[in-house]
Amino acid sequence: MPGIVGFGVASKLAKENFHGNVSKLMTLKKRLYQGIVSEIKDVHLNGPNVEEGAPHILNISFAGVRGEVLLHALEEKGIYVSTGSACSSKKKGQSHVLKAIGLKEDLIESAIRFSIGIFNTEEEIDYTISVLKEKVNFLRKYKRR
């Protein structure tokens, strides 16, 4: 019985805070996107305009950098991201979703998915941008030809 009551309270709070949470997520997502495109060259937004997609997910390809390699470089700095699309996160191989939206193979292989939560902060977003700039520039020096 306590679990049901707790779920009811959690549901009520989620409903009451829904619009505020969506607004916060969208603000953080825009900050992340704007920071990435202003600090790093040759990036590609995978999906709709940043304001039209889900407020908590940003999928970007970094030309000349394999997504899996960048994922591990970011992990070393305490930043956890995913490769591919949210719809294919448990499947091996290239994302069928990124293929379906018409991305070329090189963009699919360089895709990183950022998932933002309501407890993330602007400082964490800024840290992520700073680390991304450092790691992407470093990895591009060693890209396969």
Predicted features by range, described:
Residues 1-145:
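Pyridoxal 5′-phosphate
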